[in-house]
Amino acid sequence: MNLKTVSGSAVELSEVAFGREFNEALVHQVVTAYLAGGRQGTRAHKSRADVSGGGKKPFRQKGTGRARAGSIRSPIWVGGGKTFAARPQDWSQKVNRKMYRGAMQCILAELVRQDRLVLVEEFAVAAPKTKELLAKLNDLNAARALIVTDAVDENLYLAARNLPHVDVVDATAIDPVSLIAFDKVVMSVAAAKKIEVELG
């Protein structure tokens, strides 16, 4: 497929990587799995079995006038355990490589259809200056943008570090959530070619 850069020059890119029909169910599944994989899963509470003490019956069964009790660590007592105590859990979901690649292709193709993918010949800043980067992004009408480069550019990374709605990633490190989260994806032609090889 033929795409145009901001300067107007044509770029030939794979129909497979940048022109696939959108599959909402697939994208939803992959994005959900990606977010689930990011969960720490270390949440833990103490049940009545975990709380220290409570082995002895606090008072006799009958004759006190009180409700019967077998332990001072019952969940209905102050200082007792939690009824359904949370346990550490692995939240990760299995996603096949083919599904992941398919979802990435769907997202990139949808970015193209929605005019949210901005192709540039090259995207760099002379010095790590936020002001300079902001001016470039404003020229591209991309205030909230993910910048995808073909290689790690320290100047660009440092210039974008202080901008809350701008992120810089290498073409090999893009993920489905980042591509969806930003209003625009500013991508160099070299990065697009790199992605084409990965997903094509």
UniProtKB/Swiss-Prot annotation:
Domain of life: Bacteria
The keyword Translocase belongs to this UniProt entry's keyword annotation: no
Any GO molecular function: structural constituent of ribosome
UniProt-listed InterPro entries: Ribosomal_uL4, Ribosomal_uL4-like, Ribosomal_uL4_dom_sf
Pfam families on file: Ribosomal_L4 (PF00573)
NCBIfam families with a match to the protein in the record: rplD_bact
PANTHER family found in the cross-reference section: 50S RIBOSOMAL PROTEIN L4, LARGE RIBOSOMAL SUBUNIT PROTEIN UL4M
Name this polypeptide is given: Large ribosomal subunit protein uL4
Species, as recorded: Acinetobacter baumannii (strain AB0057)
The organism's taxonomic lineage, starting at the top: Bacteria, Pseudomonadati, Pseudomonadota, Gammaproteobacteria, Moraxellales
Gene name as annotated: rplD
